[in-house]
Amino acid sequence: MTLFCRTANSTAGYVDMNVCIGMIGVVCFVFGVFILIFCSTLKAFYVRQKTYHLLGTESDDEETTVWEKRRMESDTDF
């Protein structure tokens, strides 16, 4: 970084230190946004693949009831 960034009193051809720090901040921000979008996309594809797999599998078990109806009185009995 010292080859590219110099202080304001340096010779011409180098970038000012404040500009260099700003560019590093912008590069880190862009890299972070890229990582965020990339991870979100991978997670979306993984969830979609997992959902299709779960919907595509046939269950041999007949007792796959998730919700079971109950009488209204049973909820209030203690």
Curated annotation (Swiss-Prot):
Cellular component GO terms held in the UniProt record: membrane; virion membrane
Subcellular location: Virion membrane
Pfam family, one: UL41A
InterPro entries on file: Herpesvirus_UL41A
Keyword Acyltransferase appears in the UniProt entry: no
Chief location: virion
Signal peptide: none
Membrane topology, as annotated: Single-pass membrane protein
Positions of transmembrane segments: 19-39
Domain of life: Viruses
Carbohydrate attachment residues: N9
Keyword vocabulary terms for this entry: Glycoprotein, Membrane, Transmembrane, Transmembrane helix, Virion
Coiled coil: none
UniProt record similarity statement: Belongs to the HHV-5 UL41A protein family.
Name of protein: Protein UL41A
Gene behind the chain: UL41A
